[in-house]
Swiss-Prot record:
A GO BP entry: microtubule severing
Keywords linked to the UniProt accession: Acetylation, ATP-binding, Cytoplasm, Cytoskeleton, Isomerase, Microtubule, Nucleotide-binding, Phosphoprotein
UniProt subunit comment: Interacts with KATNB1 and KATNBL1.
Record's protein name: Katanin p60 ATPase-containing subunit A-like 1
Superkingdom to which the source organism belongs: Eukaryota
Compositionally biased region (Basic and acidic residues): 116-127, 143-169
Binding site for ATP: G248, P249, P250, G251, T252, G253, K254, T255
Positions of post-translational N-acetylmethionine modification: M1
E.C. number(s) listed in UniProt: 5.6.1.1
Subcellular location: Cytoplasm, Cytoskeleton; Cytoplasm; Cytoplasm, Cytoskeleton, Spindle pole; Cytoplasm, Cytoskeleton, Spindle
MF-aspect GO terms: ATP binding; ATP hydrolysis activity; microtubule binding; microtubule severing ATPase activity
Length: 490
């Protein structure tokens, strides 16, 4: 125990008390009292130990005096009505031709609302219901019997709420409620920022909503879905894959595959981007990465989807790499290496699976590529997949009887899934554009819904294809295929 540190803390506590900074003074007093208590436990000589206990008692008395000062100052902040009525005889004689002075409004402190740690923010409909019960901003008056709360009462209430929150978190699963993550040691703002990135515990995207990509669906079922159904089988060398990397051109359905994985498994789905894990403050980005994986293990089974992972974990050792970026990459690699929730002694149903997507696989760091054990190629849709995409995108639109989706699917060869969706959207708007051509705004507003619900024709698709070109070139496809031949692991 450093005796100089004890003396320094006691000196600072007294100085802050003299300067009127009572909060800081109480912190130093608490720290030095705890230090003396620990030091007394290590002292063997009874005489020396008695002197230290006497010093501790004196500091406790000073600490209580500071607390009483704080309590007195807080009691001054509470408005109290006068103890005796104002006599009418003291008022000056009023002139009837002059307006009397306004009556001063009575200021009352708002009632203190106790909130538990597990309280979640209400939805919009809940907020509307609260507003319907009574006028907003009208607080109930405080009765005279209520006593002003002191700092000691606040500490006791806060301590009681923390204990209750921990107990509720442990019993949350048995009550059927979703337990709340206890982020002890982390900033509350960081936890709330990551909780906002929990897209949903059920994103409602199913395999049938994704056309084609049968090989990718099969691998993702094997990596995520089957370990949930057969936990006894996926043990030892058969443990589930720790990470899956989806490689392919933009707009081929990588994000929808990740959401379908979370839906089919019923897992908590974290949608993470580079902006989520970066901060301008030194060391906070590494904290965010570590906190993300701790929350994922708490809410397990979990799917962490990192979109555009090349922007977070690009190749290390380059000349233009910043030192802060290197620390974030190192923390991400460390957390991913220890994220295997289905190792020999762990429950596969409590696993955390990292699902990543990128359009630039050649920029990814080698160590990250090793941790993402499965690397699959998400190609452009085939002829069958293009026809299925047309049916999915046009299922809410009326089609002309003469239109053949198979013929249109042949014409859009080389288009990605996003390109096909844009073509369908543009073609479905062609009839509306023809109908409102030359009309004034008043005439457009007067149109009925039936006049705009016109079937989509083959000519509409031909016009849309003239306006929208494919976004992926043949050179890009060759580059992806070459990388998969060298580093693929399907």
């Amino acid at each position: 125990m450093n005796l100089a540190e004890i003396c320094d803390n006691a000196k600072k506590g007294r100085e802050y008390a003299l300067l009127g900074n009572y909060d800081s003074s109480m912190v130093y007093y608490q720290g030095v009292i705890q230090q003396i208590q620990r030091h007394c436990q290590s002292v063997r000589d009874p005489a020396v130990k008695g002197k230290w206990q006497q010093v501790r008692q004196e500091l406790l008395e000073e600490y209580e005096q500071v607390k009483s000062i704080v309590s007195t100052l807080e009691s001054f902040k509470i408005d109290k009505p006068p103890d005796f009525p104002v006599s009418c005889q003291d008022e000056p004689v009023r002139d009837p031709a002059v307006w009397p002075p306004p009556v001063p409004a009575e200021h009352r402190a708002p009632p203190q609302i106790r909130r538990s740690n597990r309280e979640v923010r209400p939805l919009r409909k809940d907020m509307a219901g609260v507003g319907a019960r009574g006028p907003v901003g009208r607080a109930h008056p405080i009765s005279k019997s209520e006593k002003p709360s002191t700092s000691r009462d606040k500490d006791n209430r806060a301590r009681g709420k923390d204990d209750k929150g921990r107990k509720n978190m442990q019993d949350g699963a048995s009550d059927g409620e979703i337990p709340k993550f206890d982020g002890a040691g982390y900033d509350k703002d960081l936890i709330e920022a990551l909780e906002r990135d929990i897209v949903s515990r059920n994103p409602s995207i199913h395999w049938d909503d994704i056309a084609d990509l049968e090989e990718a669906k099969k691998l993702l079922r094997e990596a995520v879905v089957l370990p949930m159904w057969m936990p006894d089988f996926f043990k030892g060398i058969r443990r589930p894959w720790k990470g899956v990397l989806m490689v392919g051109p933009p707009g081929t359905g990588k994000t929808m595959l990740a959401k379908a994985v979370a839906t089919e498994c019923g897992t908590t789905f974290f949608n993470v981007s580079s902006s989520t894990l970066t901060s301008k403050y030194r060391g906070e980005s590494e904290k965010l990465v570590r906190l993300l994986f701790e929350m994922a293990r708490f809410y397990a089974p979990t799917t962490i989807f990192i979109d555009e992972i090349d922007s977070i974990c690009s190749r290390r050792g380059t000349s233009d790499e910043h030192e802060a970026s290197r620390r974030v990459k190192s923390e991400l690699l460390i957390q991913m290496d220890g994220v295997g929730g289905a190792l020999e002694n762990d429950d596969p149903s409590k696993m955390v699976m990292v699902l990543a997507a990128t359009n630039f696989p050649w920029d990814i760091d080698e160590a990250l590529r090793r941790r993402l054990e499965k690397r699959i190629y998400i190609p452009l849709p085939t002829a069958k997949g293009r026809a299925e995409l047309l049916k999915i995108n046009l299922r809410e639109v009326e089609l002309d009887p003469d239109i053949q989706l198979e013929d249109i699917a042949e014409k859009i060869e080389g288009y990605s899934g996003a390109d096909i969706t844009n073509v369908c959207r543009d073609a479905s708007l062609m009839a509306m554009r023809r109908r409102i051509n030359g009309l004034s705004p008043e005439e457009i507003r007067a149109l009925s819904k039936e006049e705009l619900q016109m079937p989509v024709t083959k000519g509409d698709f031909e016009l849309a294809l003239k306006k929208i070109a494919k976004s992926v070139s043949a050179a890009d496809l060759e580059k992806y295929e070459k990388w998969m031949v060298e580093f693929g692991s399907a």
